[in-house]
Amino acid sequence: MMEIDKKFITKLLSEAAENPRLRQNYDLRTSSDDNSQRMLNALLPGTVVPIHRHPNSTENVLLLHGKLAEVLYEEERLGDGIEPGDGIEQKPDKAIGRHLHETARIVMDPSSGSYGCIVPAGTWHTVEVLEPSVIYESKDGKYGEDGSETV
């Protein structure tokens, strides 16, 4: 049995402080054959988590320690400047660029009664770390094989 207690959280945060990325994860899966992701993630202010999405899975995020904001975005596809009737074949699924605009910011802080969130599949998101924090996160699919995309 493994106990996730104050001592373990403190150790994980110390490891994050020594990591140049200012974060450290701890894999909670019991086997590499497990087709899911379940982990603890220690995050320090200043860490950069790129805006990303998981097209095929929701992401469950529970804050165990600290304070952070889960930031959600909506994608606006930007066209290529070609007007209908120009005689050039248009491919509506191939936008030249994209613009993301913030749609929600969920501040998780156990002292204020906010403990976590579920990010819908396909939603662009990131986190802003407001205090040293540890989250439990889970989603479907093996890491690196789940179809995740970054901006």
PLM feature segments, named:
Residues 1-36, 50, 81, 92, ...:
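A short, N-terminal "cap"/entry segment at the start of jelly-roll beta-barrel domains
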Residues 56-78, 92:
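Glycine- and acidic-residue-biased ligand/ion/polar-headgroup-sensing regions
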